[in-house]
Amino acid sequence: MNIRVRKIYEALFVLEDLRELFRQAVPTGLTKEEEEYFLEGIIHVGSIIQELKEGKGNPIQDVSAGLELRTREEEFININPIQPGGRLTPEARKTLIAYGDGYSVCDQCLEGRLDKIRKPPVDEFHAELAEFVGMDEARVVPGARRGFQAVTSSLIEKGDIVLISDLAHYTEFLAVEIAGGVIKEVPSGPKHIITGDAVADTIERVKREMGKLPKLIMIEHFDYSYGNEHEVYGVGKVAKEYGIPFLYNGAYSVGVMPVNGKQIGADFVVGSGHKSMAAVAPSGVLATTDEWAPTVFRSSHIAGDISGRSFENKEPELMGCTLMGGTVLSMMASFPRVKERVKRWDEELEKSNYFIREFLRIEGNKVASEYPRKHTLSKVNTRESFDRIAKTHKRRGFFLSDELKNKRIVGEFAGSTRVWKLNTYGLSWARIKYLSEAFIEIAKKYELTVR
């Protein structure tokens, strides 16, 4: 437990209480009682700051009753497989303070459309998003899953066939199911990599067996299970040859590496804000071409039979507006850093491979993902190393979690010493080296051979 981290949180919370004072007071000024409360609060903040300087005092434990303080990003190195890319930037955290209220983005909404709001510049952000992923139009959505759903709802009718990877995320299955479609999986083979040839073979199989072509192809650039890179350029080429729309699933790529949907051959690009764009959940992006925008971003045409009301400015597949407050503003606040960090993807891969090389020095450790690594998310196999220790340790598999936590490392699947995942994205070189050394030190402690 880091007392300084806890004191920073404590000071922030006291300042929030003072902020609430102004939210409750009349705009003309504070009453005598409110002024006294304010001054007491300032004194309290001062005492906390003094404790912060000295590194002493009682550490707070909770945000509020029943809600534990979350400090894993400040007090630990977090290697959770799904969290690093969504770690908020300082700008996003500051923006949440100002725009955390429910409909905060709607203060000056003049047209009833999220992507038309000019202050804050949500309209400009949408245009930048489309350019960022190399497409023509974009919308923010409540997570990548809602992007999948918008596309399947627009393109798929009952009985239509959709190709997905045998490593696809469950939300792709559900998006097809809701639309009434039928799933056919593309095999990833023994290397766990989807190729353009495998997609073409599956299309031909579907054509022979079903007598028709698939209506949509949905393939991820990097899967969530292995973090392997799939041949999306090859898939895009095959999709064009057969005239089948291609949805590029960039949940683990958009926001951490350069992505250009048109160069890939995608008709739709879906990204995750909370997974890879340093944004609050649920958030994401759906981008498409001028060809498909009128379909997936179509306007509403329904009207009430009594009132005659209609909502032509709303987009049905998105259920109108999507991210109305802190979610979209966190995406916007982080976006300048996100645009810069994708340029450093090669360095992230260097760090990922450095760690894996060090990790493999421990005899019995294996990497289940493709190697060398092409992503920061990796699946590792420690059956012949740490799991051997777990079999006789009184804490079983939790011994590794205990040892890592003692070294201020969290995020691995607690209790797992067989096959598990980790993600090194965003860690500094100092943290990467510390992480690598920590595993080696644990191995040596339990007399595992280190090469």
Regions found by a protein language model. Give the residues of each.
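Active-site C-terminal subdomain of aminotransferase-like
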Residues: 271-374
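Conserved N-terminal alpha-helix of the aminotransferase class I/II PLP-enzyme fold
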Residues: 81, 92-147, 153-154, 167
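Conserved PLP-anchoring active-site segment centered on the Schiff-base-forming lysine
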Residues: 154-170
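PLP-dependent enzyme catalytic core of the Aspartate aminotransferase-like
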Residues: 2-46, 204-205, 340, 406, ...
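Active-site phosphate-binding strand-loop segment of PLP-dependent enzymes
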Residues: 194-255
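N-terminal "arm"/small-domain region of PLP-dependent enzymes with the aminotransferase-like
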Residues: 3-112, 317
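Conserved active-site segment immediately N-terminal to the catalytic lysine
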Residues: 260-274
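Conserved PLP-binding catalytic core of the aspartate aminotransferase-like
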Residues: 349, 353, 365-403, 426
